[in-house]
């Protein structure tokens, strides 16, 4: 597990949000899931994001809840931002670095080349670069390894991020389309073999939907994600030597938001976990 020789900038990861891009409750949703969250703030959730602590402070994803998420970290000054991809829910918080808010100076923006191109094609985001609020930086380091995964790649690509440390390697994979495509791309037959090849002891994994029947007013196949139900069939019960697998990026409809649901209990009994805001992971 130890990663000797790594230039260690970060020594801890904090989970700053666990929901899908729009959070919970969602605008316009009148279903029980969001009405419950409006009535009971303990059921509200911020979009998925990570705080990176150590010699510097960084974040992964810039969500609409950026201000509240940074407050969870003591309102620390941000040195860099890592992006997995450029769907709106993962980048809309970038505007907070502009003149209307922080007016930051040369905060590093670490993203893939196709995301760089996407940012520079949009006047709002491009201004953040031209005004010096953000500056592009390398999309890898001794401690952070991007791994490309398939996820609706018409405009830009998507990556998982592997954070390497002396105590744990943490894989962050909040979005991908299907296990078949992802495993084919990375060259493994099942998720656990892939995680083992990365020496990942903690996996923060796409848990968007529990099953294929959650979206009542949309065609769910147009929002591709492996369901949790499918994923745990591939994983089976957790065995000695398996990594901690923690499901994040939960859609507002996902029954895993309720700790007393049958689905939550099934997952828990198999040895897997649901992410909670404020969880900390030592690197």
Stretches with model-predicted labels:
Residues 20, 88, 116, 210, ...:
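Residue-level marker for beta-strand->alpha-helix junctions and adjacent short loops that shape enzyme
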Residues 58-60, 82, 170-172, 203, ...:
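Residue-level marker for buried hydrophobic side chains located in beta-strands
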Residues 55-110:
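Active-site metal-binding motif and surrounding structural segment of the metallo-beta-lactamase
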Residues 113-125:
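A short, active-site helix/loop in glycosyltransferases that binds the activated sugar's phosphate group
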Residues 76-78, 101-105, 125-137:
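A short alpha->loop->secondary-structure connector
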Residues 169, 177-278:
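Cap/insert and terminal regions of metallo-dependent hydrolase folds
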Residues 5-73, 136-190, 195-196, 279-283:
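Core dinuclear metal-dependent hydrolase active-site scaffold
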Residues 107-116, 204, 246-248:
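Short internal beta-strands
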């Amino acid at each position: 597990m130890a990663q000797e020789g790594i230039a260690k900038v970060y020594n801890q990861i904090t989970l700053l949000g666990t929901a899908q891009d729009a959070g919970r409750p969602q605008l316009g949703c009148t279903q029980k899931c969001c009405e419950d969250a409006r009535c009971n703030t303990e059921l509200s959730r911020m979009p998925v994001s990570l705080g990176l602590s150590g010699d510097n402070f960084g974040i992964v994803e810039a969500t609409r809840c950026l201000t509240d998420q940074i407050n969870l970290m003591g309102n620390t000054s941000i040195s860099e931002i890592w992006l997995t991809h450029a769907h709106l829910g993962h980048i809309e918080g970038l505007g907070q670095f502009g003149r209307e808010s922080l007016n930051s100076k040369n905060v590093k923006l670490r993203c893939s080349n196709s995301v760089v191109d996407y940012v520079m094609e949009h006047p709002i985001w491009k201004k953040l670069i031209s005004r010096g609020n953000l500056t592009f930086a390398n999309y890898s380091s001794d401690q952070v390894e991007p791994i490309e995964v398939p996820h609706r790649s018409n405009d830009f690509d998507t990556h998982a991020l592997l954070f390497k440390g002396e105590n744990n390697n943490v894989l962050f994979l909040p979005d991908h389309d299907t296990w078949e495509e992802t495993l084919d791309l990375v060259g493994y037959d099942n998720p656990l073999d892939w995680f083992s090849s990365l020496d990942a002891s903690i996996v923060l994994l796409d848990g968007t939907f529990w099953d294929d029947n959650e979206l009542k007013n949309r065609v769910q196949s147009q929002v591709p994600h492996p369901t949790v139900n499918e994923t745990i069939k591939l994983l089976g019960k957790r065995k000695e030597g398996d990594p901690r697998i923690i499901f994040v990026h939960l859609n507002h409809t996902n029954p895993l938001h309720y700790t007393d649901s049958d689905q939550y209990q099934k997952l828990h009994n198999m040895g897997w976990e649901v992410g909670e805001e404020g969880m900390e992971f030592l690197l």
